[in-house]
């Protein structure tokens, strides 16, 4: 993701009501073709820019999410979450609209050289929910990493699954493809979040899919085929998250105390 990654989704807000800092960075591009067993691409270690965003004066006041940061009794990556309406992320609404117009989850749709949607969904039958997460994560991770500039000629673009099948994409595009795949396999949208975060070890912006399951928050990451609990990834500092039900701004606990509502592969 490039420096204007967040600008694609976030409108310009007045600085007086700032809730959080958002961070920017980049990752290494990869070849266009999607080999059957390609490994996820490592991230490029580039400096991260910083920009402050604040809530618009006419927006609904930000309120802490119930039961910790997720509404599932889990403080995601140790944060407090402030919930906001989807209207504050018009780019995500555009993703939802484009995906509805170009669905890929029909039985005969060819996903790669050897797998149709019917075959992939058949492989998920009889598996535990956690095993399904592992299946979906590793399946989409076979696509190579490719930057938005190489794909679309612009620094920031969130691709829908139909576009990802043709061109692959970068970290948020993997997360989007996994989100909609799991939704088709029966996972409720409310139990999933696309999370935009800062990787404090690699010093870059990144995006993953988080799925809440059996009292845990599991991370599906294009950098690893290992699906693991969020608590093991202490280098991940979430900035905001989104699903079809709403958007959340995430702040570490100590920082949140000063904020009042309203205002490499493994």
Locations of regions flagged by a protein language model:
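A structural boundary/capping signal
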Residues: 2-6, 11-16, 25-266
């Amino acid at each position: 993701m490039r420096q204007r990654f967040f600008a694609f989704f976030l409108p310009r807000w007045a600085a007086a009501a700032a809730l959080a800092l958002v961070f920017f960075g980049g990752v290494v591009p990869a070849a266009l073709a999607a080999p059957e067993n390609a490994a996820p691409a490592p991230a490029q270690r580039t400096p991260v820019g910083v920009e402050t965003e604040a809530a618009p004066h006419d927006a609904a006041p930000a309120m802490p999410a119930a039961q910790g940061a997720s509404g599932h009794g889990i403080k995601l990556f140790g944060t407090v979450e402030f919930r906001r309406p989807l209207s504050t992320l018009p780019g995500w609404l555009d993703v939802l609209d484009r995906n509805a117009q170009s669905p890929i989850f029909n039985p005969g749709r060819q996903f790669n050289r050897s797998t149709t949607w019917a075959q992939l969904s058949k492989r998920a039958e009889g598996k535990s929910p956690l095993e399904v997460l592992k299946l979906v994560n590793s399946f989409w991770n076979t696509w190579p990493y490719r930057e938005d500039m190489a794909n679309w000629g612009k620094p920031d673009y969130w691709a829908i699954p139909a576009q990802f099948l043709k061109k692959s994409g970068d970290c948020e595009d993997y997360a989007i493809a996994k989100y909609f795949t799991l939704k088709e396999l029966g996972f409720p949208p409310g139990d999933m979040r696309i999370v935009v975060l800062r990787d404090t070890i690699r010093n870059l912006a990144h995006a993953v899919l988080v799925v809440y399951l059996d009292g845990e928050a599991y991370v599906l990451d294009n950098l690893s085929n290992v699906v693991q609990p969020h608590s093991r990834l202490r280098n991940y500092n979430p900035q905001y998250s989104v699903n079809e039900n709403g958007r959340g701004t995430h702040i570490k606990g100590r920082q949140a105390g000063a904020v009042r509502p309203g205002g490499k592969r493994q």
